[in-house]
């Protein structure tokens, strides 16, 4: 799962221009802390689907919290297994 988190972290940092912010960690709430907005969430899901050739459904979004890099990586890992 560490590789998934690294890819997510790198994508989010590059796409949303997050420099070496000490508050940007794997367990920070990306939305509440203002790192990502709702449009950004769509971009993250698109990145995941393209990178891992999986589909993130509306059901996934409803059932599983995906507010942190840790939570998103868990969903991806579960979809891959």
Q: What are these model-derived regions, one by one?
A:
Residues 39-42:
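Short alpha-helical elements of helix-turn-helix
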Residues 61, 70-76:
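C-terminal structural segments of small proteins and small subunits
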């Amino acid at each position: 799962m560490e590789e998934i988190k690294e890819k997510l972290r790198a994508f989010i940092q590059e796409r949303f221009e997050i420099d070496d912010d000490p508050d940007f960690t794997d367990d920070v709430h990306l939305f509440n802390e203002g790192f990502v907005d709702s449009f950004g969430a769509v971009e993250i899901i698109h990145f995941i689907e393209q990178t891992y050739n999986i589909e993130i459904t509306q059901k996934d979004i409803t059932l599983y919290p995906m507010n942190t890099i840790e939570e998103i990586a868990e969903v991806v890992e579960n979809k891959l297994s």
